[in-house]
Curated annotation (Swiss-Prot):
One Gene Ontology MF term: tRNA binding
CDD domains recorded: RNase_PH_bact
Pfam family, one: RNase_PH_C
Keyword terms: Nucleotidyltransferase, RNA-binding, rRNA processing, Transferase, tRNA processing, tRNA-binding
Binding-site residues, phosphate: 86, 124-126
Reported function: Phosphorolytic 3'-5' exoribonuclease that plays an important role in tRNA 3'-end maturation. Removes nucleotide residues following the 3'-CCA terminus of tRNAs; can also add nucleotides to the ends of RNA molecules by using nucleoside diphosphates as substrates, but this may not be physiologically important. Probably plays a role in initiation of 16S rRNA degradation (leading to ribosome degradation) during starvation.
Family matches, as PROSITE patterns: RIBONUCLEASE_PH
Alphabetical GO biological process terms: rRNA catabolic process; rRNA processing; tRNA processing
Descriptive protein name: Ribonuclease PH
Stored HAMAP family: RNase_PH (MF_00564)
Catalysed reactions, semicolon-separated: tRNA(n+1) + phosphate = tRNA(n) + a ribonucleoside 5'-diphosphate
Species, as recorded: Rickettsia canadensis (strain McKiel)
Subunit structure: Homohexameric ring arranged as a trimer of dimers.
């Protein structure tokens, strides 16, 4: 039994609050257990220099954690004068993942910036950020189409992410911080809506894991992702 009382295949309680921010084209506050992330999507009429004149858009992402989002206060990276390696890795992951589910040609010569700000961290911030960012992106595209800025919907697919790992010899879904910090294996899976993989980030923390164990984690992660896709659809259809 997990310390939280959850079953091995059980997600933490999840909520998706639409449009908590009034200025972004799309936004979402995602809560997965005690991990809370605000995700927003903002549209700009400029693109990176390497895309100018190509009639193609771009999606990029920025990620950050509030100083009090963890048990011990973390210093703002702006004060330190540079982003940490973890921050850069996560925001690149989010940007790559989002670009996989949008037709950049149909976006036209504009850029959508995804901002993910962690309010409270209890494991799985990057996976929560990706799942919430899809909602923000979807709402932004919906608004751009309503305003006739976009004529065709450039979204190709849903996207969601979830962690899976081996903790005390058991394959478990959606690791919280205590589980993540003591797991033998920790893998983040990013899925498209049809179940295809977009990205896999995995590490053996204590000893190597077998192909059989990996496939068991993949199978469990697919079940979790299916629940996330269902929840995304429910909140979007009701908005």
């Amino acid at each position: 039994m997990r310390q939280s009382g959850r079953k091995s295949n059980q997600l933490r309680p999840i909520s998706l609050e639409l449009s908590p921010l009034v200025n972004a084209e799309g936004s979402c506050l995602i809560k997965i257990g005690k991990t809370h992330v605000i995700c927003s999507a903002t549209c700009e009429t400029t693109v990176p220099p390497f895309l100018r004149g190509q009639n193609q858009g771009w999606v990029t992402a920025e990620y950050g954690m509030l100083p009090s989002s963890t048990s011990q206060r973390i210093k703002r990276e702006a004060v330190l004068g540079k982003q940490g390696g973890r921050t850069q890795e996560i925001q690149r992951l989010i940007g790559r993942a989002m670009r996989c589910v949008i037709d950049l040609k149909k976006l036209g010569e504009r850029q959508i910036i995804i901002d993910c700000d962690v309010i409270n961290a209890d494991g799985g911030t990057r996976t929560a950020a990706i799942t919430g960012s899809y909602i923000a992106l979807h709402l932004a595209i919906r608004l751009l189409m309503k305003k006739s800025i976009l004529k065709v919907n450039p979204l190709i697919s849903q996207i969601a992410a979830i962690s899976c790992g081996i903790y005390k010899g058991e394959t478990i879904l959606d690791l919280d911080y205590l589980e993540d910090s003591d797991a033998e294996v920790d893998i983040n899976f990013v899925f498209a809506g049809n179940g295809n993989l977009i990205e896999v980030q995995g590490t053996a923390e204590k000893k190597p894991f077998s192909e059989e164990q990996f496939l068991a984690m993949l199978k469990l992660a697919k079940v979790g992702a299916a629940e996330l896709f269902k929840l995304q659809n429910q909140v979007l259809l009701g908005s």
